[in-house]
């Protein structure tokens, strides 16, 4: 019923339309509250991970921001970019399962220790797989160390088997990691980080993602968040 004829002949909007609009407004408010709650929860989880790994404090937040900026440069819509930023906040959640002495070791990891560290991608999936996110967050987290030629981990996926969000997180992760201090080495700088992704464009890293990242930083003057 779209309209209601009043007894005096005046056409007025039907009550059901008013009710529908009110319901839509209430739903929109609820969705915003839910999004805020989810962001707060993911931030808390990210903080918990970084408490165990102080050398990468802020790493997840920065990766999320970089990934979102790259996605925006690629033409992704705002909601999808925001979701990717949130995924960045928890992309290393699986490090909870890695012994702290490995996370903070001041020298390079042994082969055995490296295998334990690599387990964080699968552990992240296992932690998040039953959470009803509106996107395949757990799968994206599991794939953020996969590489286009199949040389990544944990599944050895290649090409289109890797979800677009994971491809962007992979590049954002490399750019942030190489530009930041680590227990076993000083920061190598943005120039070296860009060289890494450009030299391996199409082999390890998605070419479209690399092109967008390079343009964002070298042409648009994007500065990595501190």
What is each of the regions a protein language model found here?
Residues 30-32, 39-226:
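Metal-dependent catalytic cores of enzymes that make or break cyclic nucleotides
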Residues 6-16:
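PAS-family sensory domains
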Residues 9, 20-23, 194, 218:
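A broad, low-amplitude sensor of folded, mature protein cores
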Residues 5, 24-25, 56, 171:
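General helical structural elements
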